[in-house]
Amino acid sequence: MAFRQPNTKELKVIRKALSYYGSGDFLSHYALLVKEGEKKEVYGVSKELYGVIGELNPHYAGVKIGEVGRRFRFSLEGTFWLLRNSRNRVWVNERGEMLFLYGRDIFAGSVERASEFGENSIVFVCNRFDDVLGIGRSRHSSDELSNLPEDKVFVENLVDRGEYLRHQKTYLSF
């Protein structure tokens, strides 16, 4: 599959997602390429590399930042690279971090703080250093956190950075 530039509709969807998460300036520093196959994978490459990709026709180039369709879905690499604001984030303590990286869900007692989001929202799970550990789905709104018992699941693990070691789930889970 060859790389191509995103079409107008795809670019609009990608720009909207980048802007929502505070990375609107990403496109001024990097170029986007779409690799169409079973899914439309979006890759970010440097402007210098972008100039020679057409001549090389590589199988892979740059960093996969997500997939585009009716909406843009960040990849784990994309979240680490692109998220610049605190929107839809949950910060966990060390124990919560360890359990999440082992594939477990986040319990209310492991959450140190959370930005504002609703129930069933896609959230980005972070450690105390602001590293994105993975992507989850909230079972409750952030407003309900203080009223939940510590042993209640607050965020369901969809995919995490420990995934490549376990090989149990696929990245298609979200």
Swiss-Prot record:
Protein name: UPF0113 protein AF_0058
UniProt-listed InterPro entries: NIP7_N, PUA, PUA-like_sf, PUA_sf, UPF0113_PUA
Recorded family membership: Belongs to the UPF0113 family.
SMART domains per the UniProt record, alphabetical: PUA (SM00359)
Domain PUA: 87-161
GO molecular function: RNA binding
Species of the source: Archaeoglobus fulgidus (strain ATCC 49558 / DSM 4304 / JCM 9628 / NBRC 100126 / VC-16)
